[in-house]
Amino acid sequence: MAKLNVGDEAPDFQKPWTGEGEFKLSERRGDWVVLAFYPGDETSVCTRQLCEYRDNADKLESVDAEMVGISPQGVDSHESFIAHHNLTVPLVADEGLEVAGAYGIKVAGVLRRAIFIVDPDGRIAHRDVKALGLSFTDSDGIAAALAEARAAAAAG
């Protein structure tokens, strides 16, 4: 799929996750949602990324948005990853990379690290796709992007 831009409708998906049942994006209409795509459980940068979110959970909770991590590993891998590092962000299993493909971040069979903020109307309010997998958007960056997206939505 082509690159998604701010204002585009966020592709809906339903996938297994570490929460109850399955995660379905369209069931979150009316709420802000942060989708944090990362390449893999237990890899060095991804572990740093998810641990940074854990260590700054208060900042992420203060932005009043549901945040989920998404990677190609299955729920069993995600549950082990969460337990090993005491992670606080629930994780979605995109084993076939269908979600990554729908969001335009599947490249050569892997996904790019990315943050998408979805507004209460189900539209992309912010996107940050990393060209290289060595850096990630931290909690401060997510909080700032969400504040900016909320301000833009309020301004109409």
List each language-model region with its residue ranges.
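Chalcogenol-based redox active-site neighborhoods
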Residues: 1-156
